[in-house]
Amino acid sequence: MLKIEVADTFFKRLRGLIGRNNLPQGCGLLIAPCNSIHMFFMKFDIDAVFIDKNFTIKKIVENVKTWTGLAFCFGAWAVVEFSAGEASRLNLVVGQKLEVEINT
């Protein structure tokens, strides 16, 4: 089960992962609502996993680069950001439902 932190307020979504050096394996940040991301001010590359309200994966964008990366998914409700390489390591695929443990 994936451990997920939630960014569901304006300021939490605005900050996202800015200022962090990494995310541990199996951990991610859920930004909701959100269907696009940028990588300005980020310190590490990420995998962006766009999901619907049922946590079904709609799109996976791997290895989004710091400062230059952008990713979006029309129709997505949210995005879960993981450290780069996690989507592959976890064998995530489009259509799969994410099983998550929400950390508050």
Per-region residue spans from a language model:
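Compact, glycine-rich, soluble single-domain proteins
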Residues: 1-104
